[in-house]
Amino acid sequence: MNNLNNLRRVSYKDFEQNAFNPTWSGWKTLIEIEKKLKPSKYYSDPISHMYLFLNNYWLEEAVRKALDLSYKSNDHMAIYDYSGLNMPDFVDDNGVTYELKQGKSLESLELIAEKDWHGCKVKLFYSRMDKCLYSNAGGAFNWHKLCSLDIKHINPDKGLKLKDIVL
């Protein structure tokens, strides 16, 4: 694994506090990091792309707290200058691994390749439509609702754009 201390990074807490501040000094680093990441399927604007990362952080934090899980790796508190690890997101006290995905609805599950679950024991899926977290510990479509979660969210279409940022 990469030594995270030697990488450029922006903490999610700093990003959260400055997400609508066009003069924030962290934008320069975020834009440099975004250039090294896999391009967004949804947004060509780098700032819109970065809002997706912040939204995902808020979801991961809510799930971690709701299910009393720990992060499997130490790369979940900041956006780093490298691609993520191919391992599950979470682990519980018994060593059971969990991977979290999200989509508009349960129908979105059809778009997630098995390899993207990273060999986890428990699959977690957050449906943005009904704001519910589901789990599947086996079986093709054996999903069970765990809980409702109202997650903070920035609509990237309504946030800042690169043209708004003062570098």
Question: Which residue ranges define each predicted feature?
Answer:
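Interdomain/boundary linker segments immediately adjacent to catalytic/signaling cores
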Residues: 1-66
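Intrinsic-disorder/low-complexity loop/linker signature
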Residues: 14-17, 49, 95, 119, ...
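Active-site metal-binding core of divalent-cation-utilizing nuclease and nuclease-like domains
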Residues: 45, 73-93
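Nucleic-acid endo/exonuclease domains
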Residues: 57-82, 104-106, 131-133
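Conserved catalytic cores of phosphodiester-cleaving nucleases, focusing on short active-site segments
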Residues: 67, 90-102
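Short, surface-exposed beta-edge/turn micro-motifs
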Residues: 87-88, 94-95, 119-124
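Catalytic cores of nucleic-acid endonucleases
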Residues: 100-149, 153
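Charged phosphate-binding loop/patch that engages nucleotide di/tri-phosphates or the phosphate backbone
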Residues: 150-167
